[in-house]
Each structure stands twice: as structure tokens, then as C-alpha cells.
Amino acid sequence: MPEGPEIRRAADNLEAAIKGKPLTDVWFAFPQLKTYQSQLIGQHVTHVGTRGKALLTHFSNDLTLYSHNQLYGVWRVVDTGEEPQTTRVLRVKLQTADKTILLYSASDIEMLRPEQLTTHPFLQRVGPDVLDPNLTPEVVKERLLSPRFRNRQFAGLLLDQAFLAGLGNYLRVEILWQVGLTGNHKAKDLNAAQLDALAHALLEIPRFSYATRGQVDENKHHGALFRFKVFHRDGELCERCGGIIEKTTLSSRPFYWCPGCQH
């Protein structure tokens, strides 16, 4: 599943294609959304936001399209009039004079009014977004030490969107390697230096993944163009200590780590 940086890049691409342009055609596959088609003709997208792995397309009439790609959903940008050759099932079409954005295969799609943005079950449940520039290491540290999260092993905590939105498996692996911790550690057991390092890494690594999308590198995952230190590198040498990177399973997901320097 794409993680926060990849969802944010998808949002950037959608914004670049149609933001501010009047919608000339709107189509939704799901019957409960059909009524909104005519309401959106002539309106425009004001911005495309993200909350973790959810994408929020905001319109000029104050409606917001909520979509979560889950495992299979994917957005495409095409020239208006172009029909992509695909076996995927079309769910959403937002068309302007020159560009059209298409959502395929996703099933978690809703239209929200302003007051629903604070009451929607997923949006209520997720924690602060790691790509939110207003989120600071100090706030992350407070969350790590809160009664809700301080006793949880990082193996599961760093996959829990209620803790921080936008994290996923490759980020979990890379963050824990960066700070020399394992998936079995808990925030309550860390010293001040470890806690500080983790709080910074939880923000810096996702933001670095997002920001370095233009760099060329062979180690790619869902378009994250930054160099993996351990993810998908089992059997290779750890660049920090020279140990052998291992692969195991933690919280039902593949986990990569170096026993030589993560302990």
C-alpha cells in the first residue's frame, strides 16, 4: 500500500492538472454519489489535501471528495478526451477543458460537507499527519509518551494511523534503523536521547521521502525516490556497522533490520 509521501505526491499531481479550472464533466460510479454530479459542474477544485493515506479533494462549493485507495485504488491524470487502456474499474471522473483526473478500483469514496470533515470515522481516528509542516518533534514526543501509546511496541505502533498518519511499512523499517531501535522497543523504555532521535526521525524520514522525489535512485518503492538503508535489502551489508541485514515478520508485515546495530 502506498504510504504518506506517495499519497501526497499523487495529490500534487492532481492539483497540478485541474486546480482552479472549471469542471466540464463529473461522473461517479456509486449511486449514492450521482446526485453530486450536477452540483459540481462549473465548480472547480480549490486544493487536494491528504490525511495519512486518505485523499481529500476540496471543491469551490465547499464539498469535499474523500477517497482512500486502500490496496488497489489508483488516480490517473490524462488529457481530456483520452481513454486509458486499462482493465481497472473507473470510480470517479473529474474533467476540465484540458485535463481529466480518473480514480480507478477504489471502493472507499464519499462526499463530505464541511461539518462532516470533523466527524468522519476515518478522519476522526487518524493522528497528526507526518507531512503536516505544523507538526513538530515536540508534539510527536508527547504522543510517544502519552498513556495511549507509551506501552506499545514500535512494531505495531508505527503502523497505527491513530498514532501518526501517513506511516507505513517501509517508513517503519527505515525509521527504526535510523535510530538503532528494534520493533520490540517501547517509548517508555527509551532514554532522553533515544526519544529525541526517534521523534525527529518520525518526521524527517517521511518528509525526506516526499521531498526527494526528483532524485534518481534504483531503490524505489511506490515512487519514493530515496535510498533505502534496510528495506528489501536482506542479506546485504549494513552500511553503518557492516552486519548482515535480516528479514523477519512483525505485526504481520515484512520487517528488515540489522541485528548488529539495532538493539
Swiss-Prot record:
Query: Which reactions does this protein catalyse?
Result: 2'-deoxyribonucleotide-(2'-deoxyribose 5'-phosphate)-2'-deoxyribonucleotide-DNA = a 3'-end 2'-deoxyribonucleotide-(2,3-dehydro-2,3-deoxyribose 5'-phosphate)-DNA + a 5'-end 5'-phospho-2'-deoxyribonucleoside-DNA + H(+)
Q: Which residues form the signal peptide?
A: none
PROSITE patterns in the record: FPG_CAT (PS51068), ZF_FPG_1 (PS01242), ZF_FPG_2 (PS51066)
Tell me which residue ranges form FPG-type zinc fingers: 229-263
Residues annotated as binding DNA are: Q70, R125, N169
Cofactor binding comment, as recorded: Binds 1 zinc ion per subunit.
Q: Which GO terms describe its molecular function?
A: class I DNA-(apurinic or apyrimidinic site) endonuclease activity; damaged DNA binding; oxidized pyrimidine nucleobase lesion DNA N-glycosylase activity; zinc ion binding
Protein family according to the UniProt entry? Belongs to the FPG family.
**What function does this protein fulfil?**
Involved in base excision repair of DNA damaged by oxidation or by mutagenic agents. Acts as a DNA glycosylase that recognizes and removes damaged bases. Has a preference for oxidized pyrimidines, such as thymine glycol, 5,6-dihydrouracil and 5,6-dihydrothymine. Has AP (apurinic/apyrimidinic) lyase activity and introduces nicks in the DNA strand. Cleaves the DNA backbone by beta-delta elimination to generate a single-strand break at the site of the removed base with both 3'- and 5'-phosphates.
Q: What is this protein called?
A: Endonuclease 8
Give the organism, scientific name. Shigella boydii serotype 18 (strain CDC 3083-94 / BS512)
Gene transcribed to yield this protein: nei
